[in-house]
A protein has these predicted regions:
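Extracellular/periplasmic solute-recognition and catalytic clefts
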Residues: 167, 256-267, 294-296, 307-374, ...
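A structural "hinge/loop" feature
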Residues: 66-83, 105-108, 136-139, 165, ...
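Gly/Pro-rich hinge or "lid" segments in bacterial periplasmic/extracellular proteins
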Residues: 97-99, 178-206, 210-307, 315-316, ...
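Detector for C-terminal structural segments
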Residues: 44-45, 52, 79-80, 213-216, ...
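Short, well-ordered beta-strand elements
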Residues: 57-66, 120-125, 150-153, 207-209, ...
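Aromatic- and charge-enriched surface segment that lines or borders ligand/interaction sites
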Residues: 110-170, 208, 317-320, 381-383, ...
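N-terminal lobe/hinge region of extracytoplasmic solute-binding protein
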Residues: 45-47, 63-117, 155, 248, ...
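Short helix-initiation/N-cap motifs at beta->coil->alpha
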Residues: 248, 308-316, 334, 495-505
Length: 620
C-alpha cells in the first residue's frame, strides 16, 4: 500500500506500514442482486434494535497527514483512503486485535474457511444476520450481506474498467481470474452474470474460491478492505466516479460527510451488531496487559462518531494534539524532542496530563524509486545504470535519519522491514554512501563536468535529475538534503511539487522520474517484492521496472516454503534491485503515538486499519 514518504515522516505514518505477519483482504460478486436478499419491505427500514452499541456522544477526533483519494475499495491504494474503507466494509477475515505473532480470524465469515485437501479451494460461510447500512438503493428494505456480495467484489477487481491496483495478486492466485479479465478487455465489457470458475456462490451464505495452486499468503489478502462485501445495486446506482464518494458497507461506520482533502466524518452504522472486547494480550508486555485489563468485557464499538481532519504540516498537527483538538497523534519527527526524553521515555509534562504512549518499530519501508522509462535516468544501458547507482550512492541516508527522522528510524538494508516475515537480519546491502565512488563512476561513464562543476549527459546534453515531492515542510527539508547530495556529485536537481493523489496517478502512468514513497501493511516478503514485478507496472511498480530474471525469481519466491532456498531467492531479488539501481532504500520507522487521557484502550495493530471499534473514549 503506497504511502507518501513525507507523510511517513510527518506522522511516522498515521497507521502502521508493513509487518512480519500477514497482510491483505479481498473478495466478492456474482449474479444480479437487485433486491432479492432484502428482508422486510418498509418505506423506512427499522435497524436491528440489538445492534451497534456505539454512543453518538462519544466523538473521536483524529488527523491524517496526507490527503485521501476516494472510497471505492477496489480502486484505491493509498493508506488513508483504505483506513476509511476499512471502517465501512467487512471482509470475510481479519486479524486478532492483540495476538502476536499476528493471527487471522473470522470477521464476516462464520468460521475460518474449509480448505480442500490439495490446498486449492477455500470455502467460506458468511454469518447470517449481517446487514448493509440503510440506503436508497435498497428501496426501503433491509439488505442482508450474503455470499454473492463477496463474489461481486472480487470480480470487480477483474473488470478492466476499474483498474484495480490488486489485479496482479488475483491474476496469480485465483483460477480463471486472468482469463476473465482478458476476455473483458477483448469484448469491452465484463460479464458479471456469468459463473466464474474460480469465484462462485454455492448457496445464499456460502462461496468458494479456487486457486491456481496452494498459496501460503492467500488468506492475508482477504483481510483487506478491498475484499469487503459490496452491494451490486449500490455500485450500479452511483457509477464509476460517484462511487468514490458514496461507499456503502456492512461495517461499523457510515461516511456521513466528506470535504475532499479537508474533512471526513464517520458515524456509527446502526446495523452493525457489535461485539464484546475479549482479546488475549501478549505475555510479559506491561502496556498490552494494561490495555487488556482496562477494556476486557466492554461492549464494542463505543465510539459513535469519528472526525478526521487533513493536517499536512507537522507543526499544525502537533499544535492540534497539544491543544486537544485531536485525541491521538503519531509524533512528527520534528517534534519528537518535545514528546520524548533522550532515553525515549515520555516527557513528564505529558505524563502529568495523563497522556499515554504507544511505541513500535513499523512494518514499513521507505524508498526513492527511479523510473526506468524516464528519458534522463531510465533505461538499462550501462551508462544509465551507472547514473542511477551514482545518485543512490550520493545520497546520505544516515543524515536523513539523523536530521529529518530525528533518529526515529532504522536504516534499511533490504526491501523487507525487520518486522515482516521474510526479513533476513544477516543480509547487508551492497550500496554504501560514498560521494567519492559516485563521482568516479560518473567520470568513468562519460558524465563530464562543466565550468560550474555540473555534469552533462554522455552525449553532451545537460544532465538534470528531477524528483517529485509534496509541499510539506518535511519534504522541503528533504529537498534540501537532496540538493546538497547532488551538488556533491555535480548533478543539477530539479524539484517538482504536487499533491499526493495526483502524484500517485502520474506514478501509475510511469510519468514521474523519481519520488520518495513508503510501502506499508505487507504481512510477508512476497507483497513487498512485487513492487518491482513487471506485472505490477501501472499498479504498484512505480519504477516501471521490467527484468526477466527478477520476474523469474519472484515467481519462484511465491511457490517456496520458508527455508534456505527461499532466503536465497530473496537475496537474488535484493541484488537485482541494487545492481540495476531501481530503488534507493531509506529506512523503517520507529513510531511514537500519543493519546490523551480520555482515550481508553488505545494501541496500534501493524495490519488493521480503521481500528476505532477497538477502543473507547470518555464523553466531554
Amino acid at each position: 500500500m503506497a504511502v507518501e514518504f513525507s507523510t511517513r515522516l510527518d506522522l511516522l505514518d498515521q497507521w502502521g506500514m508493513l509487518l512480519k505477519l500477514k497482510f491483505k483482504k479481498h473478495l466478492s460478486f456474482l449474479g444480479l442482486v437487485g433486491l432479492c436478499c432484502a428482508q422486510l419491505a418498509f418505506a423506512n427500514p427499522v435497524p436491528n434494535p440489538k445492534a451497534n452499541p456505539a454512543d453518538p456522544d462519544k466523538v473521536l477526533k483524529i488527523a491524517f497527514p496526507s490527503t485521501e483519494t476516494g472510497f471505492d475499495p477496489v480502486r484505491v491504494n493509498d493508506l488513508y483512503s483504505n483506513t476509511i474503507t476499512a471502517a465501512i466494509l467487512q471482509p470475510l477475515v481479519t486479524y486478532d486485535w492483540m495476538a502476536m505473532p499476528t493471527r487471522i480470524v473470522p470477521h464476516a465469515a462464520e468460521a475460518m474457511p474449509e480448505v480442500s485437501a490439495d490446498g486449492r479451494t477455500y470455502t467460506f460461510k458468511v454469518k447470517k444476520g449481517l446487514f448493509f447500512t440503510p440506503h436508497e438503493a435498497f428501496k426501503g428494505q433491509r439488505r442482508e450481506l450474503i455470499a454473492q456480495d463477496f463474489v461481486y467484489t472480487l470480480l470487480r477487481h477483474a473488470d478492466p474498467k476499474n483498474r484495480s491496483p490488486q489485479v496482479s495478486d488475483f491474476d496469480d492466485k485465483i483460477f480463471g481470474f486472468a482469463d476473465a479479465r482478458k476476455k473483458a478487455v477483448a469484448s469491452g465489457k465484463f460479464d458479471y452474470d456469468q459463473r466464474h470458475p474460480g469465484i462462485y456462490v454455492i448457496d445464499r451464505y456460502t462461496l468458494a474460491i479456487q486457486l491456481n495452486q496452494p498459496d501460503r499468503n492467500f488468506l492475508s489478502l482477504l483481510t483487506n478492505p478491498f475484499a469487503g462485501g459490496m452491494a451490486r445495486e449500490v455500485v450500479e446506482k452511483y457509477g464509476f466516479e460517484e462511487l468514490m464518494a458514496n461507499p456503502v458497507g456492512s461495517g461499523p461506520y457510515i461516511l456521513e460527510k466528506w470535504v475532499r482533502g479537508s474533512k471526513i466524518i464517520l458515524k456509527a452504522n446502526p446495523e452493525y451488531p457489535g461485539f464484546v472486547w475479549d482479546f488475549e494480550p501478549p505475555a510479559n508486555n506491561p502496556v498490552e496487559l494494561r490495555i487488556a485489563s482496562q477494556m476486557q468485557g466492554r461492549k464494542m464499538p463505543q465510539v459513535g462518531r469519528v472526525e478526521v481532519s487533513i493536517i499536512e504540516e507537522p507543526q499544525s498537527m502537533w499544535l492540534a494534539f497539544s491543544g486537544k483538538e485531536i485525541d491521538v497523534v503519531a509524533v512528527p519527527p520534528s517534534f519528537i524532542e518535545k514528546a520524548l526524553t533522550p532515553k525515549n521515555d515520555l516527557q513528564q509534562t505529558w505524563v502529568a496530563q495523563g497522556v499515554n504512549m504507544y511505541r513500535s518499530v513499523e512494518p514499513d519501508i521507505r524508498y526513492q524509486f527511479f523510473n526506468m522509462k524516464d528519458p534522463v535516468i531510465g533505461g538499462y544501458t550501462p551508462e544509465k545504470i551507472a547514473l542511477r547507482r551514482a545518485i543512490i550512492m550520493g545520497f546520505d541516508v544516515d543524515e536523513e535519519i539523523r536530521v529529518i527522522r530525528k533518529g526515529q528510524a532504522v536504516k534499511a538494508q533490504q526491501m523487507v522491514s525487520p518486522v515482516i516475515a521474510g526479513h533476513d537480519p544477516n543480509y547487508k546491502s551492497l550500496v554504501k554512501f560514498s560521494p567519492l565512488s559516485a563521482n568516479a563512476l560518473l567520470d568513468e561513464f562519460g558524465y563530464k563536468k562543466d565550468a560550474k562543476g555540473y555534469r552533462s549527459m554522455p552525449d553532451g546534453k545537460p544532465l538534470v535529475f528531477t524528483i517529485y515531492s509534496s509541499t510539506s515542510s518535511i519534504d522541503r527539508e528533504r529537498d534540501e538534503l537532496w540538493k546538497k547530495s547532488m551538488d556533491r556529485i555535480g548533478i543539477r536537481l530539479k524539484v517538482k511539487k504536487d499533491k499526493f493523489p495526483e502524484m500517485l496517478k502520474q506514478g501509475k502512468q510511469c510519468a514521474i522520474p523519481s519520488w520518495a514513497l513508503g510501502w506499508t501493511r505487507s504481512s510477508e516478503a512476497e507483497f513487498v517484492m512485487k513492487l518491482l514485478y513487471s506485472k505490477t507496472i501501472g499498479q504498484n511498480n512505480y519504477a516501471c521496472f521490467e527484468n526477466a530474471e527478477y520476474d523469474a525469481n519472484f515467481e519462484k519466491l511465491k511457490r517456496l516454503p520458508d527455508g534456505p532456498e527461499r532466503t536465497k531467492v530473496l537475496h537474488n531479488l535484493y541484488r537485482l534491485m541494487e545492481v540495476n539501481g531501481v530503488l534507493g532504500l531509506s529506512s523503517t520507522g520507529i513510531a511514537t503515538r500519543l493519546s490523551h487521557q480520555r482515550v481508553e484502550g488505545y494501541r496500534k495493530h501493524p495490519l488493521i486499519l480503521g481500528d476505532w471499534i477497538y477502543y473507547d473514549i470518555q464523553k466531554p
